[in-house]
Amino acid sequence: MTWIACELHTHTFHSDGKQSLTELASGAKALGFDCIALTDHNTMTGLAHKEQVERETGLSIMSGMEWTTFFGHMVTIGINDYQDWRKVGPEDIHAGLARVHEQGGLAGMAHPFRPGSPMCTGCYWEFEIGDWNEIDYIEVWSTTFAPVKKNNIRAYRLWTDQLNKGFRLAATSGRDWHSQEPAGEPVSVTYLRINEGEAPLTDRAVEALSSGRVSVTLGPRLDLEVNIDGDVYRIGDVVSGPDKTGRLAAVQVMADFTVRHEHWHLPEQRFTISLQSNLGVLSEMAALPAQLPLHAEIPVQGLLWMRAELWGVIQGVRTLIAFTNAIYFA
């Protein structure tokens, strides 16, 4: 398997963006991305020349659309056909989710706590979710310098709350990218760990997101591995099999500080790596990049999930810099 750098929330002038698909793809390639999802508001017309743009830029483009309603915005990825969003009301979002899943697509909550009307029509999520198993992911980091923004902190907490309830859903970032104007702030990246193979990269990216093989960062890519009695589990995996009560997990946290290194800057510092779970903080360790990977032994009993977080200072602010998606425990 290999990691690819992705941007999962973008717009062109086919909705409210100020860029063509070619400009968007060229800009993404220049920033070190391997793949984007085009998610224009309520239209897929911007994808008409997708294959040509992919050939010209060398960037892979996932098909998608942002359902933009009065009751919330929902990003759909991996769909091939337009789905009419207009009949979905606040109490029947599951009808829309079913249509997306019938196409083999994924559905994610976009910026669920961004201020809504009249500032941004429908940006605040108000749909009633009856079954969280039908939500594939939450966009917990939205726009640039995402982790310092209150609405994103709430979205991250929402994701954690659902993990604590036993649901298994991914967490992503999304720039909500509308133009090629310089960001001026740190840009986050969603890394997807895709299978090797002959299938189109975009199909493998959708599968990776569906499986929760996701790591999100403002800079270095964080990875997590658990070894229990010789069985190795990675991000998105489910620890199952014989009863592991009373056993210890050998946990390894890795960080690659070379990825896209020309596109981000962190001052020299000791970073804090935190292992989080439904039981709270399992372990915290301070380390310089040269001291990685770090290792810990963690009791398995009572665990539903585990993720790694990297904390440090960026642009003078101490904040969450990177996080992995979860490893789950059956």
Label the model's feature ranges.
Residues 169-170, 271:
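Residue-level recognition of the N-termini of beta-strands and the immediately preceding loop/turn
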Residues 1-3, 177-330:
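C-terminal functional module detector
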Residues 105, 136, 188-190:
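Generic beta-strand structural signal
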Residues 1-120, 125-127, 133, 140-159, ...:
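A metal-dependent hydrolase metal-coordination microenvironment
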